[in-house]
Amino acid sequence: MNIKELELNFKKNIFRNEDDIKIHFHSDIVKPLLIELNPDMLNQYKSEDVLISGGRTDATFQNISFELKKENYFSKEKGINEALYGRNELDHGLYDYIISNAGINVNDKDEIIIKKIMRGIGVGFDGKKFVFARFIASPQKNRLDTSKVKLKIDNPLNLDFIYEVKEFQPGLKRLALLLKQQEKCTLNKSTLCSVIHPKSEFVRKSIYLIYQNLRKN
């Protein structure tokens, strides 16, 4: 995958607003990366995904939640904070999306909740820079803010919320690694059908191997 070529193709566009960023982020960055690195998961990228536990992401891909902003929005700390935590008490940010997208059940024990939340990743993008956010294990217990999501986590958990800002090219390389992942895909009807279907490269290769083995025997 030629990362530099992806960068050049993306930057050829004119970005008048946030919607332009969203459109070309998918068409010029995410889609080519998935076709090259993870084609069987191409239809797992969902734009404006409404999460069951609250919030509507600009997009999701498996355990990754995206928050896309207008060009150069992350040039100021205020823009980064908005991507992370939302504009106000009613607006969601990556912090909320990671929790909401974790698939937490009301009967989950603390250790299960921790594992689920730590699998989540938040990615912000403003056409210039990337913001990568996640929860990591912490020796200190902290109470999570779930005021914006439709679930309640009563107990403080051994988790810390961290983020880092990366320039375009190193951020794009990090994104490529994240999109390549498959081991963190939730095992459910939706994700299974996205991999196991007649047009899937995985299915075609598997059938061919079975056919070859049957011929030999």
Predicted regions: what they are:
Residues 1-121, 129-216:
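A short, conserved, highly charged catalytic patch centered on acidic carboxylates
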